[in-house]
Amino acid sequence: MIGHTHKDEFEIGYSNYAKQSFATANSMSYIAPALTPTSGSPAFRIYSLDPVTFGVLDFTEYSTSLESSTYQSASGPVWAPYYSAKATYGPLVTQPVTTPSAELSPAFWHNVTTAFEANDTAFQEYVARKSRGWGVSSCTGDCKTDEICQLRAAEAQYNCATVSPGIDFKRDEAQAKVKESECHGSKVAEMLRKIAKRVA
């Protein structure tokens, strides 16, 4: 279990990236969402593990609504189950994985991505769960292809994201599209924008 990206995601590793299949899927990265409400409602996961193999049997994601009247009250937020991985994704695969003792193996998750390719409703529901239903937009065409590619790219050299090198110092802030870090760990971009404004 690794992460964080502030989103509900996973990535599959393969013994042979040239022949990605359920047979070559050999590792998993579970990327949990954040308690920080920057990309959706706060959420956390509880994993169920096999006590002998330590394989993941299921996880349940819990979330709270930012719009709830109790969110910032003295009683605190109310956490409720958002979804179970096995209950949500288990029925999607050709041989449904629903029994409590069945592991959610890398092969299982590869088969889930195959189901996403064929079942657009299931894929769009996955996209909505990434942010716990917050700010959801449709992901079709290249977006869908890239997202499924990324789910199958646990090793960095197979990453599907397109990186544009360089720094863009546009003066027109309406045209500038700056991707902010959701963790707010670096203030360099903000500082450079302020300097550019003063120079302009």
Sequence positions of predicted segments:
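Metal-dependent phosphoesterase/phosphodiesterase active-site architecture
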Residues: 7-200
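Active-site glycine-centered loops adjacent to acidic/histidine catalytic or metal-binding residues
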Residues: 3-4
